Structures are given as structure tokens and as C-alpha cells.
From Swiss-Prot:
It is found in: Cell membrane. Its main location: membrane. InterPro entries: UPF0114, UPF0114_bac. This is UPF0114 protein Avin_40830.
Amino acid sequence: MERFLENAMYASRWLLAPIYIGLSVALLALTLKFFQEVYHLLPHVLEMAEAELILVLLSMIDMALVGGLLVMVMISGYENFVSQLDIDEGKEKLDWLGKMDSGSLKLKVAASIVAISSIHLLRVFMDAQKIPNDKLLWYVLIHMTFVVSAFVMSYLEKMAKHAH
């Protein structure tokens, strides 16, 4: 009975595979949204104010960062929790493939969240005259919470690796 339960639990890791496939569908949706933004931007780029253009570009950078986060979580999550990727010889292989454990994945996700939050904060500050001061304060506090959390996670991961 114990062996059956252990094998069933181990096999259940494959239930994560459709979730990672779903993330690739989400990446496709993000890509479509990105090019929709490009399509709307190009006809008006010469008549846009510089600040408005920068806001659109920051939005596009934000989408690129979220896309990178999706790829990182999708691939390293699959490798860490489901199965190793069997990439054919001669194909491009990402440098970090097979080297990122769940701890380093958490740190990369935290760093990505801080970067995404930074872009959002920059967009907010570019439009600060339209936003009440109390909301600006909340944006900064939330961003600082992400930053401090990333530092704490990094410190704890370093301490855990040092203890081993």
C-alpha cells in the first residue's frame, strides 16, 4: 500500500505539465497583445508627445519582462518538478537550463517582480500629476515591499546554501 501511494504521488507531478503548457498559451496571448500595441503605436508615433511615447515603450518593456518571467517559470518549473527537458543536440540550449533549482527560481522570480514593479512605478511617476499623493505613497510602499522581500529571500537562500 505504501509503495502504491508513493508511486501515485510521484506520478502526480505530471498534473503540472498542463499548467506549464497553459503558461505557454499565456505567453502567446502576451505576444499577441505586444504586437497589438506595436500596431497601434506605429501610425501615431510621429504625432505623439515624447512622454506619451515613453509610457507606451515602458508598457512594452513591461510585457517583455513578464514574458521572460513566464518562460523562466515554465521551463525551470517543468524541469524541477516534472521531467528534464531532452533538447536535441545541435539546437540552441539556454545557458541556465538544468542549473536552476527551486531556490534560485524563486530568487529570479522575485528579481523579475521587482523589475516589473519598477517599470510600473516609473510609469506612475511619469503621470504623477494625475495621481493623488496618497496613492503614490502606496505605490512606493508596495514596490519597497517587493524589494525588501527579494533581499530577504536572497539572504535566506544564501544562508540555507551556506548551512549545507
